[in-house]
């Protein structure tokens, strides 16, 4: 018996257990399968729950492009290779969209351009790189500034018959000070709303390291310190997209008012958080992972951390700054760390602004203070400090559908 001889329900049940990237290769097998993978929301939901998770490291380069990353940790000499950039055509212009910032949640990327070029207006895009689906959103000219953050999360809502829960995706837009916060709901609205009281993202708290945010189980985690008790140090706050409030407080392994380096990432399929930190005035750098976060209370989370890596690096190496990003391989006890260096160039009298040479550096750090520099690339000189932060993230390919405003069909880019 071959697959065409099986009933459709059984075929769908089998395909629900095939990794998403493999399904993309099967789209040309039949018209029915193509429609199933592209347009069937029920199948996409089933696939999300039943298919094995896979991860594809992606990097935002100094050329404002998203590139898949091949990481080889086998053998004595590890390597990191950037592959061909992913295509994201600008719908209004005959060129690729320049990505200044990117945030990942649930197989979707939310990207925005940074800079003052008026041709871009203030568009942002929600993008599924696997399927090519996009939704372009007008964010308003007040959100053109580089400092603004666009992040993505979700909550669940019962359908009209209370028979099943539907994921509701929302974009949160905020400034580094946590003010002027607005929310855009992808499923139902086509406008930004300030549902958060007074537009304050973290009432009673001060945002710290606002570049460092991560999504876990649809919620947003970000660093903050309590205004009335700054001596208690930096904690993690959880923004819950169902209540649209910041509430849950997660203590860090050390209670310090500030750190030399503090970076956050998601591990274990987005079910746990990992933390790269270096205490103030110390050379020792550590990576910790949460074992469990008890989020049944809004007063504060019961959390346990496990230290998985520790390095005591020479200060002469100067590997990290506050802008470092990292991915952790728990099994191999290895971290891939990326950051972007800006070297001021000679400033001539006729130049209005100083130029900087951009250099991207990638390191692999293992046990016993082993450091391998496996990637280094120079970008074009720039006279702007906008969009300088390099980002590496663990993208989880999925078939999740992006709903258009008014319930229209999803737009697709190049496959």
UniProtKB/Swiss-Prot annotation:
Q: Where is the F-box domain?
A: 1-46
Q: Which domain of life is it from?
A: Eukaryota
Q: Which cysteines are joined by disulfide bonds?
A: none
Q: Name one Pfam family in it.
A: F-box
Instruction: List the effects observed when the gene is inactivated.
Output: Slight ethylene hypersensitivity.
> What are the boundaries of the signal sequence?
none
Which factors induce or repress this protein, as stated in its UniProt record?
Ethylene treatment has no effect on RNA, but down-regulates the protein levels.
Q: What else is known?
A: Double knock-down mutants of ETP1 and ETP2 show an accumulation of EIN2 protein and a constitutive ethylene response.
Oligomer status and interactors: Interacts with EIN2 (via C-terminus).
Q: Which purpose does this protein serve, as stated in its record? A: Negative regulator of EIN2 protein stability.
Q: What is this protein called?
A: F-box protein ETP1
* Taxonomic placement: Eukaryota, Viridiplantae, Streptophyta, Embryophyta, Tracheophyta
């Amino acid at each position: 018996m071959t697959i065409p001889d099986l009933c459709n329900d059984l075929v769908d049940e089998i395909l629900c257990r095939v990794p998403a990237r493999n399904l993309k290769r099967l789209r040309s097998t039949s018209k029915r399968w193509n429609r199933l993978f592209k347009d069937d929301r029920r199948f996409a939901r089933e696939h999300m729950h039943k298919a094995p998770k896979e991860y594809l490291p992606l990097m935002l380069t100094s050329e404002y492009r998203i590139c898949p990353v091949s990481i080889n940790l086998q053998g004595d000499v590890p390597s990191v290779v950037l592959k061909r950039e992913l295509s994201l055509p600008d719908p209004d212009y005959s060129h690729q969209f320049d990505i200044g910032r990117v945030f990942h949640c649930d197989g979707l990327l939310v990207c925005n351009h940074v800079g003052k070029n008026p041709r871009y207006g203030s568009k942002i895009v929600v993008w599924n790189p696997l399927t090519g689906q996009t939704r372009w959103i007008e964010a308003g000219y007040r959100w053109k500034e580089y400092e603004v953050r666009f992040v993505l999360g979700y909550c669940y809502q019962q359908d009209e018959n209370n028979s099943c829960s539907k994921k509701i995706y929302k974009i949160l837009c905020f400034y580094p000070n946590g003010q002027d916060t607005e929310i855009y709901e992808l499923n139902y609205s086509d406008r930004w709303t300030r549902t958060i009281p007074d537009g304050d993202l973290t009432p009673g708290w001060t945002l710290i390291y606002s570049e460092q945010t991560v999504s876990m189980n649809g919620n947003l985690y970000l660093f903050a310190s309590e205004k009335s008790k700054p001596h208690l140090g930096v904690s993690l706050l959880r923004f819950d997209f169902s209540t649209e409030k910041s509430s849950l407080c997660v203590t860090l392994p050390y209670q310090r008012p500030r750190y030399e380096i503090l970076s956050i990432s998601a591990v274990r399929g987005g079910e746990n958080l990992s933390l790269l930190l270096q205490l103030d005035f110390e050379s020792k750098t550590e990576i910790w992972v949460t074992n469990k976060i008890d989020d049944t209370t809004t007063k504060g989370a019961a959390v346990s951390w496990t230290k998985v890596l520790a390095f005591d690096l020479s200060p002469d190496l100067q590997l990290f700054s506050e802008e470092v990003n990292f991915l952790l391989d728990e099994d191999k006890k290895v971290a891939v760390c990326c950051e972007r260096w800006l070297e001021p160039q000679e400033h001539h009298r006729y130049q209005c602004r100083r130029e900087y040479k951009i250099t991207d550096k990638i390191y692999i750090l293992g046990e016993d203070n082993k450091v391998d520099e496996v990637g280094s690339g120079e970008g074009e000189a720039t006279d702007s400090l906008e969009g300088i932060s390099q980002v590496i993230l663990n993208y989880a390919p999925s078939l999740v559908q992006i709903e258009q405003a008014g319930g229209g069909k999803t737009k697709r880019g190049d496959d």
